């Protein structure tokens, strides 16, 4: 064969092979993701399908000007792309859509071939609560960005519970309930997760018909895209929660009241249908059948029948019988069904579950391969270690990390590393996955990215300091000594302690001079376990960094607001002490500084899109099709992040946020009214009347969300770097005096 002819045939063969690879459905899905995420690089990226499905893996290799990404499916290829972005482009694709990906002008080469393999087959993400604290107002554009983020981070088992009320509406209608009975049974949109988990009914309802249709169509888009990217959406199943008026149709239905939850009155209490009755299986089949018609299925369903609730009986035999009946009803509707269940209940009500073999009886009463458990809070309380690794039932190690979407710098990189590795070492063959069950997106995205990198055999994740150094480079877009110094400080302080419920600074707390239990501040945890001077030093390094990335701006704003928030929390203790000791000169001095902080925090937050209450409200209103609906959605959006129900509710402040607009018109307003009343009492020589203040401020809190007080910017305003420099200079002397040791 002549040489030119041979070369021609070889090139033709390569072109045919490349063409076949690019037409593979997995490569087609990945090509679409590449075009969305890195369109400027797309023409120089070649995708190839690896012919193995036994384990997820990817390869990266540069050939000339081309980057070759190989993977056994689109999800693995997406992880490969993200690895390239992080470790060669020094760039981060953020879960915050507004934080744009910043890429080098010249596409970097991969000097040596990279090959990584998934250590676990299942990578789970989300929490029922996330759909209330973060996602209730999302449109398709936001979901599309987030699904790409999930794919890039290797998530292949996402919770997918959007739009289920549309399914239930049809089921209940066919069973004879009226439109009013059904829609008034649902809660308001942001509170739906707790309705779905059998915690509350009715509050904030009835749901508009437009909401049901909007969410149904949105869910179709969500699950279609997730499946394109090799994910298995976890759809909801029937847990036994029924409208109380179902007894109008079925007067003999065996219903139990699940009773009080978080102080909501009896009109909001949920009714639970006994899984042992025939009606339970009938409803399960109706729901699953209709859900599959609407959204398709990957045969995995989330069902939690006793979340934060007490079962009708604690007898092990009853618990085993009930769980078996639930599974059998699911299998009757879908013979290939797997039941996914969170195990938060085993920790939250551990005083009941951890006796008489109740957990074992409950989770082992049907085939283990048909059950999948989420070990919900492993960074703090890994239940697998308390239950003989769940007695052989498959489970996923999960990092929770956040409660209520609170804005508190917090994390525990070293502990997460150690505990994940312990699960690999001692967790048994039924340890099948790594995931995260965060309640809301927060200001610590690095923790979740780290957790999902641990699902792959990247040796760098075992060296936390080295991983953090690479993270700093990604935040800077290059190697920067100042950025590295900042993140080393943060990793050694902020990101070295476990999170806890309700973490927030005192700014976000309703002011009180007395017992926080008396004035419903149960979920406020303003304590921090590091020296606040570390934040000032980290801020100085960030401001000195030689880069101008969006990620650096976010870090500067994030750290500055936490620095001031911690200082405010410490000053609050000084203020209360001065009042009790009648040291009014000291009190007024402290009050002046606290007021100054309140005035400085909001403009700082306003410079960063991730910290704007205006975005939250804008997105809520955008779903409405009438002014009435827009106002309804806005009020509901305001409520969940403030009183979480009626005024002075038990969950008040549980979902507090460090957001511009909210800080000025809600948090700062309360503090300034508090200072005014205390000052007036001192001037008059009488005790501060906290009860009167409390009643007045609770009324204002209700007005803030019901009457939709004030309008807010939905776009960032101002120069965060300049404001941070001014703040550092303004408070430096007193911060140094207080914290430098």
Where are these regions (language model features)?
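C-terminal motif of bacterial Sec signal peptides marking the signal peptidase cleavage site
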Residues: 15-17
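C-terminal substrate/ligand-recognition segments
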Residues: 525-545, 557-580
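Contiguous, structured surface segment used for ligand recognition
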Residues: 19-120
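Sec-dependent signal peptide recognition
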Residues: 2-9
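Catalytic-core regions of glycoside hydrolase
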Residues: 42, 92, 98-107, 126-130, ...
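Second-shell loop/turn segments in exported
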Residues: 66-71, 132-136, 209, 314
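Active-site-adjacent substrate/metal-binding segments within catalytic domains
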Residues: 120-139, 150
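Extended, compositionally biased alpha-helical segments that mediate assembly or anchoring
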Residues: 659-741
């Amino acid at each position: 064969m002549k040489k030119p002819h041979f070369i021609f045939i070889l090139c033709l063969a390569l072109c045919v092979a490349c063409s076949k690879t690019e037409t593979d459905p997995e490569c087609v899905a990945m090509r679409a993701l590449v075009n969305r995420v890195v369109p400027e690089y797309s023409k120089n990226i070649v995708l190839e399908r690896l012919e193995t499905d036994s384990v997820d893996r990817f390869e990266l290799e540069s050939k000339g000007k081309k980057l070759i990404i190989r993977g056994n499916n689109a999800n693995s290829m997406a992880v490969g792309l993200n690895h390239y972005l992080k470790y060669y482009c020094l760039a981060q694709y953020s879960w915050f859509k507004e934080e744009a990906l910043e890429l080098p002008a010249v596409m970097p080469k991969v000097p040596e071939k990279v090959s990584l393999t998934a250590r676990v087959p299942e990578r789970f993400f989300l929490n029922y609560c996330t759909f209330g604290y973060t996602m209730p107002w999302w449109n398709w554009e936001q979901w599309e960005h987030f699904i790409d983020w999930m794919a890039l981070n290797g998530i292949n088992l996402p919770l997918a519970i959007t739009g289920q009320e549309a399914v239930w509406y049809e089921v209940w209608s066919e069973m004879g309930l009226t439109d009013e009975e059904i829609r008034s049974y649902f809660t308001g949109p942001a509170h739906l997760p707790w309705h779905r988990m059998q915690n509350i009914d009715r509050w904030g309802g009835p749901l508009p018909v437009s909401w049901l249709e909007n969410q149904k169509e949105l869910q179709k888009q969500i699950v279609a895209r997730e499946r394109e990217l090799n994910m298995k959406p976890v759809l909801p199943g029937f847990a036994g929660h029924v409208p109380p008026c179902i007894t109008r149709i079925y007067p003999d239905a065996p219903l139990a009241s699940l009773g009080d939850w978080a102080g909501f009155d009896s009109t909001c209490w949920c009714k639970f249908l006994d899984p042992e009755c025939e009606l339970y299986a009938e409803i399960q089949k109706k729901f699953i059948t209709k859900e599959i018609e609407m959204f398709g299925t990957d045969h995995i369903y989330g069902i939690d029948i006793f979340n934060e609730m007490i079962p009708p009986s604690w007898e092990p035999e009853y618990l085993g019988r009930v769980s078996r009946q639930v599974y059998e009803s699911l299998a009757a509707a879908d013979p290939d069904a797997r039941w996914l269940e969170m195990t938060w209940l085993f920790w939250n009500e551990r005083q009941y579950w951890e006796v008489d073999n109740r957990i074992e009886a409950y989770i082992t009463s049907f085939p283990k391969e048909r059950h999948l458990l989420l070990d919900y809070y492993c960074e703090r309380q890994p239940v697998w270690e308390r239950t003989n690794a769940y007695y052989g039932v498959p489970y996923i190690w999960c990092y929770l990390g956040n409660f209520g979407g609170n804005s508190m710098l917090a994390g525990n990189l070293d502990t997460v590393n150690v505990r994940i590795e312990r699960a690999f070492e001692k967790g048994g063959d039924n340890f099948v996955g790594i995931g995260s069950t965060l309640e809301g997106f927060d200001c610590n995205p690095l923790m979740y990215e780290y957790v999902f990198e641990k699902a792959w055999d990247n040796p760098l994740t075992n060296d936390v300091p080295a991983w953090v150094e690479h993270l700093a480079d990604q935040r800077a877009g290059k190697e920067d000594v100042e950025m590295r110094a900042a993140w080393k400080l943060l990793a050694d302080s902020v990101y070295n302690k476990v999170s806890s419920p309700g973490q927030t600074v005192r700014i976000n707390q309703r002011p009180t001079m007395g017992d926080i239990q008396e004035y419903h501040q149960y979920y406020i945890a303003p304590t921090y376990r590091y020296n606040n001077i570390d934040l000032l030093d980290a801020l100085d390094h960030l401001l000195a960094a030689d880069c101008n990335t969006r990620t650096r701006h976010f870090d500067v704003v994030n750290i500055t607001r936490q620095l001031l928030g911690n200082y405010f929390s410490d000053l609050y203790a000084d203020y209360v002490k001065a009042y009790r000791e009648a040291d009014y000169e000291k009190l007024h001095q402290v009050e002046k500084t606290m007021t100054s902080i309140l005035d400085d925090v909001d403009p700082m937050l306003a410079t960063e899109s991730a910290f704007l209450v205006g975005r939250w409200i804008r997105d809520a209103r955008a779903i409405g099709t009438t002014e009435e609906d827009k106002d309804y959605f806005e009020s509901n959006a305001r409520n969940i992040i403030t009183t979480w129900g009626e005024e002075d509710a038990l969950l008040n402040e549980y979902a507090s946020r460090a957001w511009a607009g909210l800080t000025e018109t809600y948090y700062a307003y309360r503090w300034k009214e508090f200072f005014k009343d205390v000052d007036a009492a001192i001037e008059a020589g009488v005790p501060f009347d906290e009860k009167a203040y409390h009643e007045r401020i609770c009324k204002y809190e209700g007005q803030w969300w019901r009457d939709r007080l004030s309008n807010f910017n939905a776009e960032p305003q101002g120069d965060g770097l300049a404001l941070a420099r001014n703040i550092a200079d303004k408070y430096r002397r007193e911060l140094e005096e207080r914290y430098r040791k």
